[in-house]
Every structure is written in structure tokens, then in C-alpha cells.
Amino acid sequence: MLSVSCPRVYMSRKALDFGQLASCRCRWAGRSGMRVAPRRRMPCVCFVASPSQPGLAAVDVPAEAISSARTTTMIPERISVSSLLEVVSDDLLKLNNNLKSLVGAENPVLVSAAEQIFGAGGKRLRPALVFLVSRATAELAGLLELTTEHQRLAEIIEMIHTASLIHDDVIDDSGMRRGKETIHQLYGTRVAVLAGDFMFAQSSWFLANLENIEVIKLISQVIKDFASGEIKQASTLFDCDVTLDDYLLKSYYKTASLLASSTRSAAIFSGVSTTICEQMYEYGRNLGLSFQVVDDILDFTQSAEQLGKPAGSDLAKGNLTAPVIFALQDEPKLREIIDSEFSESDSLATAIDLVHRSGGIRRAQELAKEKGDLALQNLQCLPKSQFRSTLENVVKYNLQRID
């Protein structure tokens, strides 16, 4: 079973090899001055980490553990984002009210940009995951409510994500996002780049004020990973020798790193054991990889109206994603077309057809489900609650997009 890892063991810059499955019991820790929730000792499972090759990880899980966690193939009903995140709706409402004020009012252009960015809405999935993990782990530590650190962490994560979108729109020369004109379309490239830089800097300032060195290192690494992912993508355009490992590592940098670091940080602020924190990191990593693979599948299976951009646009730019990488293994003609950088008028349409006919879409779907199943396994060490159930449903929501 193939799985990419963070290129470090949190702070040590080494890879993770999640191998032998072990069992553990959840630790309970009371907080002074606070009533500790009733003690329940619940068996749970966790992974034991050991050094491995940089950037890669292998997972060896007993069959019975997989069968108990593998529920992604049966989704009884469609899940909507609004209903999915209802359990943390109050937390998200508070976050929305705070976001614009966090940007500050020093510069009218930045204020206007903040209105444009945060006013566009969005699912707020990343801060929602912070709240869900925070509340799912809080019971283990006897916390009755989330801390101010949990709340500020969610705000920081959304600011970092938004800053990355501003820069992505500049790099991709995108004119619209969420139905609104992008910052660089309204104010020009220079202002957009500076606005993104400002939001990265502002989020870093709030991050430093959390005064937790482990969380500071985790989230700071995310910003570095964003740049690494963009550079890796730019250096492999139209490269038919790009491997699945290369793709997964790039996807970790661009998507999964933020999710993994934010879910682990949420658990850290709950004060739970290192084992639980590691599992929350792996949940975010596997979920992030699954999300990226699904997005890359939709680039071939949805219409331009659904995508908000032409179908196959990543392929047209030379960005070879999972469906293409799988298709290249069986379709030599596809390599010829990509090597020519679609010089013929109908070559892109032919390439898209080859990706479909080769089974590349099907194999990418299997990869997305594999990562989703791993994410579900990572949640097994949490006590059952509506928050754990919602974290499971986030995995299912993602996979139902390719049903």
C-alpha cells in the first residue's frame, strides 16, 4: 500500500514509516481549576513510527483492522457541506466575525482586499477541521470548552490558506475565484503578491503569540512547503517521467501539509498524548492527499461549468496528475502527445480521451479511496462522539464527489 509521508518527523526532518499496528489506551489528564469529565478507558489503535526513506511511508495493517475501518465504499446518502459542519457552526461563525479584523486597518487596499477575500465565503473546511479535532480530543484531556489557542489556531490556518490562494491565482493567472474577481485582477499583480505576503506575515505574528514552539515549528514549515510544492510542480511540467511518488510528495507540499499540521496542532492544544497527536497528523495528511487526488480526477470528469474552468486544464498546462501518471503506464501515444506539448489542434482532446480509456481515472479513484481508508483508521484512537463521526464524514464527503 503506497503512502507518502511528511519529509520529516515533525521537527527532525526525517521520514515516517508507519508499520506495526499497536494498541493503546487513551490517557486522561485533569486541568487545575476545571472539572474533569467522567473517566472512560476505551481501547484504541495507533501506529508505531520508525525511520524510513525520506518522503515515503509504508502502512502494514491487519486485515481485521482494515475491514472495521473501511467504510468509505458504502455511503448511504449524499452529504452536504452545510450539514456536515453543523456541529461546529458556532465556532465557524465566531471565526468569520474575527477574520477581517485580524488583517488590520492600516492600509485601505488591504482592508478592501480582505473584504474581497473573506466576503467570498468558501467552505472554511480547514478551520472546521481544527475545531472538529479540538473538540474530539478535548474530552480525552477533560476540557469542557475549547481554549483561546484553539480558536486562534483556526483563524491562523484560514489566513495562511487564503494567502496561498492569492499567490496561486497570480501564478495561474486566474481571473475569478468563488464567483468573484481575484485580487490580482482587481488591483494588479504587485498588490496581490504583497497582499499575500502581508497575510503570511500577519498569520506568522499571531502564530508566534501562541507561544508554543512545537506548533510554531509545525505551521511555519507549512509555508515553506507551499513554496516547495510550487517549485516542484513548475520543474516537472510536461515531464512524462514524473512518478507517483513525485506526485504524492508535491500534493503533500501543496495540500496535505497544511491539513496535517493544523490537525496535529489542534490536538497539541488539547493536551492529549503524543500518540493521539501523531494520529491526528496522519489523519490530516491522508485526508489532504485524498482530497487532492479527487480534485485531480474531477479535472477530467466534470464539465467546464461545474469546474469553473476548462476540463483538463491541468493537463493542458503540463501539470501531470494521478490519472495521467497511471495512464502513461499503458498508453505510449499519450507520452508522444504530452512531449509535443499539444502542438496539434485536437491533441489535448485526444490525450483526455486516452486518460479515460486507459483506466487512469479508475486507478486514481482507488488511490483516493485508499488514502481515505487510512484517514478513517487514524481516527480509531478517538472516543466515539459527534465530532469523531463528523471527521469520518468529511472523508466520505470527499469520496462521494467521485461516486
Swiss-Prot record:
Positions contributing to Mg(2+) 1 binding: D168, D172
Known catalytic reactions: 7 isopentenyl diphosphate + (2E)-geranyl diphosphate = all-trans-nonaprenyl diphosphate + 7 diphosphate
Cell compartment(s), UniProt: Plastid, Chloroplast
Family annotation (InterPro entries): Isoprenoid_synthase_dom_sf (IPR008949), Polyprenyl_synt (IPR000092), Polyprenyl_synt_CS (IPR033749)
Transit peptide location: 1-62
Chief location bin: plastid
UniProt KW Chloroplast keyword: yes
Gene3D superfamilies: Farnesyl Diphosphate Synthase
Domain of life per record: Eukaryota
Record's cofactor remark: Binds 2 Mg(2+) ions per subunit.
GO MF annotations, alphabetized: (2E,6E)-farnesyl diphosphate synthase activity; all-trans-nonaprenyl-diphosphate synthase (geranyl-diphosphate specific) activity; metal ion binding; prenyltransferase activity
Keyword Metal-binding assigned: yes
A Pfam family annotated for this UniProt entry: polyprenyl_synt
Recorded coiled-coil stretches: none
GO process annotations (BP): isoprenoid biosynthetic process; plastoquinone biosynthetic process
Key words of the record: Chloroplast, Isoprene biosynthesis, Magnesium, Metal-binding, Plastid, Transferase, Transit peptide
Binding positions (Mg(2+) 2): D168, D172
Tissue: Expressed in leaves, stems and roots. Highest expression in leaves and roots.
GO cellular component: chloroplast; plastid
Quaternary assembly: Homodimer. Interacts with FBN5.
PANTHER family associated with the record: ALL TRANS-POLYPRENYL-DIPHOSPHATE SYNTHASE PDSS1 (PTHR12001:SF69), GERANYLGERANYL PYROPHOSPHATE SYNTHASE (PTHR12001)
Function as written in the Swiss-Prot or TrEMBL entry: Involved in providing solanesyl diphosphate for plastoquinone-9 (PQ-9) formation. Geranyl diphosphate is the preferred substrate.
Family, similarity comment: Belongs to the FPP/GGPP synthase family.
NCBIfam families: prenyl_cyano
Official protein name in the record: Solanesyl-diphosphate synthase 2, chloroplastic
Protein source organism: Oryza sativa subsp. japonica (Rice)
Gene that encodes it: SPS2
